[in-house]
């Protein structure tokens, strides 16, 4: 007897590019099973840098200004509670300093088989920086010998390197990671930044995350890349990591980076680098001021779209 497909709920949020990370954070506070993002800023970047892409989805060209975020939920008794929370949180984004854009939230049903297969169309091989290529494990890619390939199964809830914050962090890792370096990746998510550091010949990499789902995802991705110089830990940096490193990378949010700037020094060797992103432009000065107040020297500030990456050193 054929197994009957279950229905899922596809929740669609139309917002601004600036609010993508904030809306994603709202969704992660619920029992979301997957997220797909169509961002006009990403499409604009792809069009300008089309030569860096193995694949460019022409069907995304007509995305309106802003972003469309699709989240997937099991159809169960808890969904209406999540929906109310999401609607209220999106409505309140402007009180937190975000442009919510249209701020429209809608829902529809989607068949399980369609959901499981169709989300993968959003992820194609992507060149990031000088030589790193992020390749979903199900995609074929004719690699160049000079390129560094990162095999990734992002699942539905983690980034694949196309977002500006991830891209700027990887570009910074390419610039600053040296052989024999030890690198700590805070809030590792899919493990993409830690894996990039390991592939760039860091001697040792430790990735940490408070989310058990992220830890499991990162460990699987480390396995796909056959790396033995990277360890993924569950917990808080201050509690689970011992020793010092040459580079700390954190792609989180401005508030957490400001908090880290006060304590992260104890984990850095003299002359070490703190690479931070997930910072919206409106919070740039706060982050920079906090780093300076806590003894860091600003090496460089990168900006792409609405986002900022700050590289600081001791």
Swiss-Prot record:
Name one molecular function that GO assigns to this entry: protein-lysine N-methyltransferase activity
**This chain belongs to which protein, by name?**
Ribosomal protein L11 methyltransferase
- Could you tell me which HAMAP family the record lists for this protein? Methyltr_PrmA
Q: Where does it sit, as one GO cellular component term?
A: cytoplasm
> Does the entry feature the keyword Methyltransferase, yes or no?
yes
Its function, per the record, reads: Methylates ribosomal protein L11.
One Pfam family from the record: PrmA
Quote the subcellular location field of this record. Cytoplasm
Keywords, A to Z, come to:
Cytoplasm, Methyltransferase, S-adenosyl-L-methionine, Transferase
GO BP: any one term: methylation
Give the record's family classification.
Belongs to the methyltransferase superfamily. PrmA family.
Name the chemical reaction catalysed here. L-lysyl-[protein] + 3 S-adenosyl-L-methionine = N(6),N(6),N(6)-trimethyl-L-lysyl-[protein] + 3 S-adenosyl-L-homocysteine + 3 H(+)
